[in-house]
Amino acid sequence: MDASGVIDELKHRKEAFVTGHSGSSIADLRDVTLAGIFSNAAWIYVVSNNPSYRDSFWLDFLLNWMGLLCSVTVFGENPFLTGILGLSAVLLFGCISKGSKRETIKETVMDNGNQSATLTVYRSTMLILTSIAILAVDFPIFPRKYAKVETWGISLMDLGVGSFVFSNGIISYKRLKSGTELSKWAKIKQSLRSTVVLVVLGFIRLFSVKAVNYQEHATEYGIHWNFFFTLSLLPLAMIIFDFYNMRLRFVIGLIAAIIYELCLIYHPTFLDYLLNAERIDFISANREGIFSFVGYCIIYLAGQQVGSMFFPISRNPMQLLWKLVALSIFSSAISYVLLHYHPLQVSRRFASIGYSSMVISFNLLILTFDQLIVECLTSKPRVPKTYRAVNGNGMLVFLISNVTTGMVNFTFNTLDSPPYKAMAILTVYALFLAVFALKVPFKLKF
């Protein structure tokens, strides 16, 4: 077999490796989530008792980055162990480090002066885990239950996609409030600027994938569609909702999502089209990306509603915690009903209402735990430097992680990499992203 034949065979093997998966259990998603929360709690414990370690890059990287990496690789079958081992090691460290002076000075709950510490920890954890997963999924050490599902079910990577949209919705509320005095045309111009940047990124990814014959997964978004195109349409879609107040815009979005869901349930021909239609034109070729946009809109709008709780940032931490607890219980109850009694299963491929509900409820639970640990159980909020850096330049970090993933796949045969080699590559990759986030001299804003 010639070189081109070997490359084509490897491409098909890689495509098969990420195809046909059915997802993981709710318990698996819970355990990975808790591993990340416990890792950050361990870092907070160390720097609270040993202020000299607060600026330590290696402590930050070991607990916050390697903790997340290990939870989806070497401890992937039991990610809860990552958090437990991290906390145990830190408690032991605390017992033998009794000479350090504990900080007691009370600080504001703001991070970088314009955002709560909770939001910084939440967004950066989500971005780091997402960036790790998009490369780790190409290695056998990454459990297949965490890879994106084919059609029905939910996995860690499915949750990550929705979480990215949800977190963008939260932050968009701040821009929404700051732009209340802008004219309609000024808002449209602002939205178009964001859209153009993301469309350009989408086309760069599309052409690069086609040009180098990179592995593709058509049922993820379609033949030509990708996640950047979905993100690019959200600012434009939100222009329609600018005519309504916050609560009404969410209600309108929810009605649209319910109508879409009813079409999936009561119009078998529509569902059959989404599942089985030949890809003969632009719409049929990209139907996953086009029709799932309705679900991502409701996730984005829900994020805006939650953002209204965090901005302005002068709210009482405990008051905010109880609001998050109430919303978490309510959204979890809805998700439970949809998961167990709804006739249509959860589907990220079509962004069903069950999927949207799961994404919203999980993110609310994560925000609740982060609020509790970061701002309510400590004398003052503490945020790792790498978290602040990732949060402040999230889109650029996400873009670089996509580019680096492609470079790694062309450099190494990830599919046949043994565990030790996979962990070495992934550790260097995570280290590169952490250093890049800290040292990059500019920000990608739109």
Swiss-Prot record:
Membrane topology: Multi-pass membrane protein
Main location: endoplasmic reticulum
Glycosylation sites: 114
Keywords, in A-Z order: Acyltransferase, Endoplasmic reticulum, Glycoprotein, GPI-anchor biosynthesis, Membrane, Transferase, Transmembrane, Transmembrane helix
Pathway connected to this protein: Glycolipid biosynthesis; glycosylphosphatidylinositol-anchor biosynthesis
Example of a GO biological process term: GPI anchor biosynthetic process
Gene Ontology molecular function, alphabetical: glucosaminyl-phosphatidylinositol O-acyltransferase activity
Pfam families (UniProt xref): GWT1
Signal peptide: none
GO cellular component assignments: endoplasmic reticulum membrane
EC number in record: 2.3.-.-
Localisation: Endoplasmic reticulum membrane
Transmembrane stretches, start-end: 32-52, 56-75, 76-94, 122-142, 151-171, 194-214, 221-241, 250-270, 293-313, 320-340, 350-370, 395-415, 422-442
UniProt xrefs under PANTHER family: PHOSPHATIDYLINOSITOL-GLYCAN BIOSYNTHESIS CLASS W PROTEIN
Described function: Probable acetyltransferase, which acetylates the inositol ring of phosphatidylinositol during biosynthesis of GPI-anchor.
Family from the record: Belongs to the PIGW family.
Name of this protein: GPI-anchored wall transfer protein 1
Provenance organism: Kluyveromyces lactis (strain ATCC 8585 / CBS 2359 / DSM 70799 / NBRC 1267 / NRRL Y-1140 / WM37) (Yeast)
Gene responsible for this protein: GWT1
